[in-house]
Amino acid sequence: LTIMLILWHIIYIKFTLPLKSKKALKNDKADRCGLTNGVLTEKEQIQMTKDLNHKILDCTIRDGGLVNNWDFSVKMVQDMYAGLSEAGVEYMEVGYKNSAKLLKGADAGPWRFLNEDFLKEVIKTKTDTKLSALVDIGRVDENDILPREQSHLDMIRVATYIKDVDKALELVNKFNSYGYETSINIMALSHVMENELTEAFEDIAKSPVDVVYVVDSYGSMDNRDVDYMVTKFQNLLPNKKLGLHMHNNMQLAFANTLVGASKGVEFLDASVFGMGRAAGNCPTELLVSYLKNPRYEIRPVLDLIERHLIPMREKVEWGYIIPYMVAGVLNEHPRAGMALRSSADKDKYVEFYDKLTSPEAMPTNHHSD
């Protein structure tokens, strides 16, 4: 009997336990993604509910265009829409709806100045993934905007600096009357005074805008900053949905996005492989794989990276690079870092740091994407 018990114990340890451990690991991963019927704690249930309310807005084509002058092939944009749709991403920002007549850059790709007929030729059949475009104050011709029922676009986002919020809200009112979902994205928040923000919120609260964005234009915010900003927005704009647009200068875009998400921010901006101006954005593939929403699938996003983003990354540069880190730490626009990376001295980081921290350094010019 003793020998039989010993043999049974050996068999259990050698064969049965490893199988249970593998199954446990698999179930743990499934539970994290909300794919099993296991019993969840109250905290997990609350988090799952929040995750199900989140919406990912992928801005690869729009923000990534700042890297390659919007030189995306029709095939890539079609693949992006199909892939993001398969991945369960709720919105794809397909470019800017600015006017070439009001802005230099006629040599830019078509996603810089979206044309409705062209967009309908590229994306012939829409899916559940909605399409958005972004406009800048003073750069959009309102006559170019069709009523929503005549457009492929579902959402128009208005980017503005704090001084132009009144002009942004005029556009929001018009786009809202056309039937579009709308957002207002207040840029360079890390340079905005408290009283300016409070005054702007009074007008925003009375407007029909659907979503108000916390935008970390310079990639200078940390988790405490995001927590503070989101709380302020929630307190002063209780009836508005909130969004987050983070930059990755200090390797915090994903972490900061999760901070906002945990506080109930609904719209989360991201881009495939993090493609975006300078240090780039929160990677779509991270959000899709992390959020506990069974609608999200990581495989189609990995396919997009493999087929399109890897080859593109060999031609143009974005992501965490020291000059952009320095700009983020100093709460400065990355334009100086972008100029450095385009020069023969692109890796002279100490000289760059000394230049930006010298008393003669010019203050940040706010007018920029």
Residue ranges and their predicted role:
Residues 44-369:
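Catalytic cores and adjacent flexible loops of soluble metabolic enzymes
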Residues 38-39, 43:
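Intrinsically disordered, low-complexity segments enriched in serine/threonine/proline/glycine
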Residues 12-15:
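Aromatic (phenylalanine/tyrosine) cluster motif
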